[in-house]
């Protein structure tokens, strides 16, 4: 008996073959016939073939040349499927609202998150992502050291749906996996200043062991820190990494109101 030939994936992707997982991912993403959905790392189309039955438009993105050819043949008659052969990091993300349902290449998880939840915050509505369990855990740490993680939680509701076993993939990964649900929050925020907000978070997290009081005093006056504490219920003695996403955003918006622009972090 000959061995089944497995695709070579330098970015660490393992193909989803679990139909229950696929169904759960699509259901969690709340896909409708009005949605444009990206399948990042589409592989052999295991997810795409289910998405095309529900979504208005599916964009299957794949970097492996042989698999791109396979996808184009497989979906040649599908009017609502577009196959794009490229590394997702070079993909021209839609300039209109879209969702993602994807078993992403594990090796570029951080890049994918930044592209979706920071660079394309304006149009990324959310979705479901199958990814390595370890980076998923870091998203839900009680203390948030990574400025991007704070940023993501500010604008998105993130939910770890469940852990996924290696038997759900081909080839089976040696690491644990998870299904992550992402849903953008309804916030009144000027997306044009998202980089300024990230700079604010990054500045205050440069010394993560500092207390909230000491960290805020690098930007605000002492009296302003006291006012902010009372206004937003801050524990000034806690570490700055213990602030909640809503507290981060409130502090930032307060900075825009009371601190001259020349003192804003950049």
Curated annotation (Swiss-Prot):
Keywords: Antibiotic resistance, Methyltransferase, Plasmid, RNA-binding, S-adenosyl-L-methionine, Transferase. GO terms for biological process: response to antibiotic. Its EC number is 2.1.1.-. It is an enzyme of class 2 (transferase). Gene3D superfamilies: Ribosomal RNA adenine dimethylase-like, domain 2, Vaccinia Virus protein VP39. It comes from the Bacteria. GO terms for cellular component: cytosol. One of its GO terms (molecular function) is RNA binding. Disulfide bonds: none annotated. Belongs to the class I-like SAM-binding methyltransferase superfamily. rRNA adenine N(6)-methyltransferase family. Involved in erythromycin resistance. This is rRNA adenine N-6-methyltransferase. It comes from Bacteroides fragilis. The lineage of its organism: Bacteria, Pseudomonadati, Bacteroidota, Bacteroidia, Bacteroidales. The gene is ermFU.
């Amino acid at each position: 008996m000959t061995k089944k030939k497995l695709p070579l994936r330098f970015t660490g992707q393992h193909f989803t073959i679990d139909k229950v997982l696929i169904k759960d991912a699509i259901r969690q993403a709340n896909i409708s016939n009005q949605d444009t959905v990206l399948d990042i790392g589409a592989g052999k189309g295991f997810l795409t073939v289910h998405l095309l039955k529900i979504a208005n438009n599916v964009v299957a993105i794949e970097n492996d040349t042989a698999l791109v050819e396979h996808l184009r043949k497989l979906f040649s008659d599908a009017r609502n499927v577009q196959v794009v052969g490229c590394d997702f990091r070079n993909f021209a993300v839609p300039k209109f609202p879209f969702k993602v349902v994807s078993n992403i290449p594990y090796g570029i998880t951080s890049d994918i998150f930044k592209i979706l939840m920071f660079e394309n915050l304006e149009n990324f509505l959310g979705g479901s992502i199958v990814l390595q369990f370890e980076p998923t855990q870091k998203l839900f740490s009680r203390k948030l050291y990574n400025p991007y993680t704070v940023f993501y939680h500010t604008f998105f509701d993130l939910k770890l749906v469940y852990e996924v076993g290696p038997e759900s993939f081909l080839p089976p990964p040696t690491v644990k996996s998870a299904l992550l649900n992402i849903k953008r929050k309804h916030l009144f925020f000027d997306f044009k200043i998202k980089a300024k907000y990230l700079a604010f978070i990054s500045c205050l997290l440069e010394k993560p062991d500092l207390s909230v009081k000491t960290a805020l005093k690098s930007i605000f006056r002492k009296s302003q820190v006291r006012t902010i504490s009372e206004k937003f219920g801050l524990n000034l003695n806690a570490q700055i990494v213990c602030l909640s996403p809503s507290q981060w955003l409130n502090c930032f918006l307060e900075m825009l109101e009371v601190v001259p622009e020349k003192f804003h972090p950049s």
